Amino acid sequence: MGDNRWLKNSFVYLIILVAALALFFQYLGPGASQTEEKGIADVIADAQAGLVREIQAQAGDEQIIVTYNDGKKYRSRLESADSVMRLLADYGVPLRNEQGQRTINVIVQPAPAWGGLLSIFTILLPTLLLIGFFVFFMRQAQGSNNQAMSFGKSRARMFAGDKPTITFADVAGQEEAKQDLAEIVEFLKFPDKFAALGARIPRGVLMVGPPGTGKTLLSRAVAGEAGVPFFSISGSEFVEMFVGVGASRVRDLFDQAKRNAPCIVFIDEIDAVGRQRGAGLGGSHDEREQTLNQILVEMDGFDTNTNVIVIAATNRPDVLDPALVRPGRFDRQVVLDAPDVRGRIEILKVHVKGKPLAEDVNLEILARQTPGFSGADLMNVVNEAAILAARRSKRKISMAEFQDAVERVAIGGPERRSRVMTDRQKLVVAYHEAGHAIVGAALPKADKVQKVTIIPRGQAGGYTLFLPDEDSLNLRTVSQFKARLAVSLGGRVAEEIVFGNEEVTTGASGDLVQVTRIARAMVTRYGMSQRLGPIVFGEKEELIFLGREISEQRNYGDEVARQIDEEVHAIVSEAYETAQQILLQNRAVLDDMANALIEYETLDGEQLEELIRRVKPLTLDFSKSGSTTPNGRTEDRPAQPDAPQMGLGGPSPLPA
């Protein structure tokens, strides 16, 4: 594409035109003949001597072509605009002999219709070229100026509504959100129906939710269903290096929208420009605030009669300016969350359309294996499965490709079978992963073990996949948290039991980070400590739909901090003892599973179930624990969805 950029330059076309004219005059224009030139006096003398056979002339042209008796041709030029006949008569050149036969054949051709114009053009060509160069350079200078002035124009992309490409049929897994947005479609299609009852058309809809849940897709589906134009722009496209550009682009965007009303304006990632004024980590930002003020005026200012609906998407609703999200601007908030199992089935059905599937593919099983996956994750799973099937030269996508794709998306990265591991490393990783699996199988409150492997994938030397219960994604009990802590410590405990304290590796580093985070959250966030009570310690500012804390204000003293550390240590120690007790009771199963992993590298299905059935279950007694609550349940924010968990989250263990 970049190689053809020079074709768009008008200067190139000007050069081509000049070259074409030069070639025309050189080979096709007047005087293009290559015959030899002879003076008119010599021609008259030769004619008097009877050496000339024919003279060709053209009306209005001074040039003549003389043909001699021997066939040679010469060019000559008349001294004036007089005709050839008069010139020959003046010099007494006879055109006929005594017998009346013509001795010199004089041919006078009429002037061509374009000859005069061509002559005029030939004379004016240098002047036209100078004017052309002048206009060209003036336009270049004007273009540079217009480019600078175009900063104030909106960068929104418009999609016509007469040919919708996306409708509600293309969106699955968000039925409640579709119902809310279906009313927006009715507002756009039948505004009189609501106006007759005194209902006011909503000015805006704010869609909030984690990344990949379909906010942009739903907004385009609304435009497709309503059959109206759709303007799409990102919140970061408003503010530029020049002052006032953001407000100018907002005005231009809404001017375009009003000219195409009824229509939809979609602003993606509106938190980039709609952040609360005078707030944030960097303080105030005059240009961004000026842009936000213009958005506020356009959405609910003096001109409120336009049929333009603004749909905005963000995963940071907590930082938006209160004036932006008030009723009258964004009248509705539509929350999109990770789909449940029924939603995932419908999403998978949408994405597998047009793809050849093998007979063993079961979308319901696949949906149950992907709790916490967003719509974008499921789309990626289907695409990765298709890529794997093509790589394996298959004509249909089988369940094996879908299983590999789920692990690839959940853990990150392909299997690294080419990675060379020593026998010692394989042994350590095998016992580590077997420890995770056996502890998980022995605890009733733990997630179900789905697969154990020592094949490296991504940055993990091996991993254990657990299938969380759908009901536990939003609500976690104390027993579930403690079971998860014990499972996470199972790999470290297995290494200690088999190889001793001095031979424990760094393979459990990721597990220890996860254990510490969960235990501290139980004490400081969920109030699951009898010693400290149901109190939240520390005021946290969080990214609500991103699952990361960006700051925490400490609102407790040193003594309370010491007690928190003691409680966290007690919870982790209890989980460590639980994992140790389970593995000591099931040492034979631990050895057999580790040996099977070394031999087969991956255990799943019936082979894994046979080993798990031999594990002796253990029921935790929380009556003596110092970290329970009266009801034993707490709300777990959906900010950190539990995708299939892997036991070994960090780098592979170092050789002992």
Curated annotation (Swiss-Prot):
Binding sites annotated in the UniProt record for Zn(2+): 432, 436, 511
Residues that hold ATP according to the record: 209-216
PROSITE patterns linked to this entry: AAA
Gene3D superfamilies: 1.10.8.60, P-loop containing nucleotide triphosphate hydrolases, Peptidase M41
Transmembrane region(s): 11-31, 117-137
Residue numbers spanned by region Disordered: 622-656
Example of a GO cellular component annotation carried by this entry: plasma membrane
GO biological process: protein catabolic process; proteolysis
Compartment annotation: Cell membrane
Active-site residues, Swiss-Prot/TrEMBL: 433
Subunit structure: Homohexamer.
Protein name per UniProt: ATP-dependent zinc metalloprotease FtsH
Gene behind the chain: ftsH
